[in-house]
């Protein structure tokens, strides 16, 4: 059984054959930490979490290195910090913590390495210097730009001609560039900006462009060539297109990533998610509604990862009903560990066909209810748990699932928020949180050592 993945670069489904089976390398574009993650961001994380699990199953955990970056320097971050009147580091640290809480809620494993852009400025400068030395980049008006026309096969990933690619794309500082399509590698500091948003470089105080960050961090931890590069379909152009161009030009013998995997868009009630439309939904919003993380994870896996996925109340309700059905199917059965069924694994090995994998779990659940022998019931129930666990689901006992109206992660998050409020003598907020939990029949008990424990009424 071989893993097949759709490669955007070749536009074909290919057998996954890493360059070194003992050192499989995957890079995924992580969050820009300026605001709380929305469910569209989360789809990407859940998809590549599943791919990580599949690759570990094939090659072993020690053989797989999964790098997912944190972009913690960006114009959006600077603008957001200024609008909130807070230090940029306070903002990025806060949003990064929220991202980790959200991904734990969704049952995602941590990557092997999670580098921050601000901690890799030296590598970015090294690559930019290489590009300048090889006439792929130039300095003008205190900026460093990449010369797009110098890059061979620039349009290979997007499979569009150059004019089409840039239609409707906002191009800044076009008067100072050789070509309007050239993109920034390094930009100078602006007047009155906070000191901690800019860095020393051979071209003066400034900061990197967005695209160079991922090239630098993938090079640092995975080398010139690696196996998989993942991200949302919206990143194909310009971000991933520019990554390939600058990395291959900086390292002429490099092919950069071999397999390019892209997940589809997420809409809300048939419309593109947008703050202006008022349909912008964060993971925190779902947590506040006490929607269990497993429900959201199953919803995000319910459609094939390359297809669009629409968020709506019915889809979430359907995911909840499916999980209820699975948990009911294992009632009072002493489940045992069984091998992952071959048809289930075949579905995942076929370009992560999660709709088929979910159908197979449903078939095992049906099998429990129509089984004629206890041995058959036990096998079907065990297969449900084994398959669901593999894709990051059914991590609770049946009792926990049906008797926990509120997620433990969410309870502890509120308790920590309440403790912080008490330290700040914000008694109104502390009482509000206590009452909020009390409505869910959660009783708090403050201890003499300044900790708080909880129990269900």
Swiss-Prot record:
Enzyme kind, highest EC tier: ligase
Cofactor note: Binds 1 zinc ion per subunit.
Pfam families tied to this protein: tRNA-synt_1e (PF01406)
Family: Belongs to the class-I aminoacyl-tRNA synthetase family.
Residue span of motif 'HIGH' region: 31-41
GO biological process, one term: cysteinyl-tRNA aminoacylation
Annotated GO CC locations: cytosol
EC number(s) stated in the UniProt entry for this protein: 6.1.1.16
Name of the protein this chain belongs to: Cysteine--tRNA ligase
Major subcellular site: cytoplasm
Source organism (scientific name): Rickettsia typhi (strain ATCC VR-144 / Wilmington)
Nucleotide-binding as UniProt keyword: yes
Catalytic activity: tRNA(Cys) + L-cysteine + ATP = L-cysteinyl-tRNA(Cys) + AMP + diphosphate
